Amino acid sequence: MFASRPVVHPLEVAAPAHPVQQPAPGVLMKDLPGMPGTPGGLGLRVLQLLFAAISLAVMSSTADFASVSAFCYLITTTVLQCVWSLTVAIVDIYALLVKRCLQNRRAVTLFSIGDGITWLVSFSGACAAAGIPVLIDADLIMCSENPCASFQTAVAMGFMCCFSLLPSFLLNFYSIASSHG
């Protein structure tokens, strides 16, 4: 059987002076917008803090929220969300000011776990509180006696807080999953 054999011809090319400065092969996407330590990540944290603070302010401005446990739970979850978002926003601001990368495995894992827990708790609080205005308005027809619009606004801001937290969680989780590679 006649098989062809490849012939290798060496090329005379000068070696790079500093091979350490060569970029690694492949495309590196470590600074996705929305990741910790990026301007997009800081923007998401500010949105989360803003929505949680509005929900907290609107719900606590009503006099009747303390009589319903779901509303108290929403207040608790928004306080937790405010504390978490403010803390991570401060870390993001620091990282941006000193040009520090927050893409190490431990930090991203911590942010991912924190985002996952706060998302789950915030979403459950918003879902629990969402049923009460529906009950008051549709079933009991008592919105004239209760501030239903305030309740609905607080619940809507709670959901907006959850939806602005979801990209942070998913990006951090993706970063952890893709680094196992």
Curated annotation (Swiss-Prot):
Main localization (coarse): membrane
Extracellular-side segments: 60-77, 137-153
This protein's UniProt keywords: Cell membrane, Membrane, Transmembrane, Transmembrane helix
Pfam families: CASP_dom
Location in the cell: Cell membrane
Membrane topology: Multi-pass membrane protein
Gene Ontology cellular component annotations, sorted alphabetically: membrane; plasma membrane
InterPro entries: CASP_dom, CASPL-5
Topological domains, Cytoplasmic: 1-38, 99-115, 175-181
TM helices/strands, residue ranges: 39-59, 78-98, 116-136, 154-174
Family the entry assigns: Belongs to the Casparian strip membrane proteins (CASP) family.
Quaternary organization: Homodimer and heterodimers.
Name under which the protein is recorded: CASP-like protein 5A1
Source organism: Zea mays (Maize)
Lineage: Eukaryota, Viridiplantae, Streptophyta, Embryophyta, Tracheophyta
